C-alpha cells in the first residue's frame, strides 16, 4: 500500500512556480529522499504534503487521506521535523515532549509511557531533566525527532534534519533515522542537499531542481546510469583545443565541465589517466589535479542538470512556521 501518492502537484507564488507538476508514490515503510539544492522545491513539497500549504493544482494523499479535503486526518497521521528549531529552550527535554503530547489529547499515563519510549529510542533518557538550552545541536535534533514520534505517526517528514551540524553529528543522526525506519517501521520522507546523506539513508531518491524531478530511482540505480569510472581533471589554461580532441575519443562515455573541473566517465579509468594528462599537455593545458572514483549522486546531479549541487544556507524565517501562519489555514 502507498503511504503517499502525488499526482501532478503544482505550487505557485505570485507567478513563480516553486513546484512544477511532480508525481510520485512512497510505499509504507519506505525511506524516500528529496534531494536538491536550496530553492529546488523540496520544502514546499513537504509543506503541501503536511497540509501547511494548499497546492495550486494537482492532488496528493498521505496515509490514505487527501491533503486538501482531509487535512485534520492527515495531520493526525504525520509527524514533521522542520529545519527551524521548534523547541522551548527554557523547558527540559521531557517537558517539551509533555507539551507536545498534550496537544494531541493523549492521557497522562499514556503520555508518560510514550515519552519514555521515544527518549530511549533517541538515547536521551539521561538528559530528559536537562533544560534544552544546555543541549548540543545534535541532541536538539534528536529531541525534535522524538517529538515528531510521540503521537505515533504513520509518516514522518524530516526537512533537512542535519542542516548546520558537523559531519560526526550528522552521521549519528543518520543512525537514528535509519533505526526509526528499519526497527519502528515508520515511513520517512527526508529532504536534504547532502548527497552522502541521501546515498546512505534512502531506499529511493528523487532529485529535484527548479521545482521538478530530474531523476527518481534507488541510489544504486541512479549511479549505475553513469557506469564506469569518473575522472575529474582540474584544468589551467585555455582548454578549447583539448576539449575538442576529447570529443573525438569514443571511449569517453560522457563529459561535463563545471568551472575549471572537467568530469569524464569511462571504463578502466586508471589506465586512461596518463593518456589524458599527456593529451592535455600537448594542447597547452595544465592538469593541476586528477581524481579517480566511482560515480556518486553528485555526478548524477551534474549529469542531469549540468551543474553541481549548491550548499547554500537557508534564509532564516522562511518556510515552515511562517508558511503555516501565512498559508496553512487558507
Regions found by a protein language model. Give the residues of each.
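Short, charged/small-residue-rich alpha-helical element at the C-terminal edge
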Residues: 227, 231-307
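Conserved ABC ATPase "signature" region
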Residues: 98, 102, 109-127
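Conserved catalytic motifs of ABC-family nucleotide-binding domains
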Residues: 152
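Catalytic Walker B motif of ABC-type/P-loop ATPase nucleotide-binding domains
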Residues: 156-159
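Helical segment within the ABC ATPase nucleotide-binding domain
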Residues: 171-184
Amino acid at each position: 500500500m502507498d503511504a503517499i501518492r502525488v499526482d501532478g502537484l503544482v505550487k505557485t507564488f505570485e507567478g513563480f512556480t516553486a513546484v512544477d507538476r511532480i508525481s510520485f508514490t512512497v510505499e509504507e515503510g519506505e525511506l524516500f529522499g528529496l534531494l536538491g539544492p536550496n530553492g529546488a522545491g523540496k520544502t514546499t513539497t513537504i509543506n503541501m504534503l503536511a497540509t501547511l500549504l494548499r497546492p495550486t493544482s494537482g492532488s496528493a494523499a498521505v496515509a490514505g487521506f487527501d491533503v486538501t479535503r482531509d487535512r485534520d486526518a492527515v495531520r493526525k497521521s504525520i509527524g514533521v521535523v522542520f529545519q527551524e528549531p521548534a523547541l522551548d529552550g527554557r523547558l527540559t527535554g521531557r517537558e517539551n515532549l509533555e507539551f507536545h503530547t498534550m496537544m494531541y489529547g493523549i492521557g497522562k499515563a499514556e503520555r508518560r509511557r510514550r515519552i519514555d519510549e521515544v527518549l530511549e529510542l533517541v538515547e536521551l533518557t539521561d538528559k530528559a531533566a536537562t533544560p534544552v538550552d544546555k543541549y548540543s545541536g545534535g541532541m536538539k535534533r534528536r529531541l525534535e525527532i522524538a517529538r515528531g514520534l510521540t503521537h505515533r505517526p504513520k509518516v514522518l517528514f524530516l526537512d533537512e534534519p542535519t542542516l548546520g551540524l558537523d559531519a560526526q553529528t550528522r552521521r549519528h543522526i543518520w543512525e537514528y533515522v535509519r533505526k526509526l525506519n528499519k526497527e519502528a517501521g515508520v515511513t520517512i520522507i527526508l529532504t536534504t542537499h547532502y548527497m552522502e546523506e541521501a546515498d546512505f539513508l534512502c531506499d529511493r531518491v528523487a532529485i529535484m531542481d527548479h521545482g521538478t524531478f530530474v531523476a527518481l530511482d534507488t541510489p544504486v540505480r541512479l549511479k549505475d546510469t553513469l557506469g564506469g569510472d569518473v575522472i575529474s581533471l582540474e584544468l589551467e589554461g585555455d582548454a578549447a583545443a583539448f576539449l575538442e580532441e576529447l570529443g573525438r575519443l569514443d571511449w569517453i562515455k560522457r563529459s561535463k565541465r563545471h568551472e575549471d573541473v572537467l568530469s569524464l566517465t569511462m571504463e578502466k579509468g586508471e589506465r586512461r589517466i596518463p593518456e589524458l594528462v599527456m593529451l592535455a599537455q600537448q594542447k597547452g593545458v595544465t592538469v593541476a589535479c586528477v581524481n579517480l572514483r566511482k560515480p556518486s549522486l553528485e555526478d548524477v546531479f551534474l549529469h542531469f542538470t549540468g551543474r553541481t549541487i549548491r550548499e547554500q544556507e537557508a534564509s532564516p524565517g522562511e518556510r515552515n512556521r511562517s508558511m503555516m501562519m501565512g498559508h496553512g489555514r487558507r
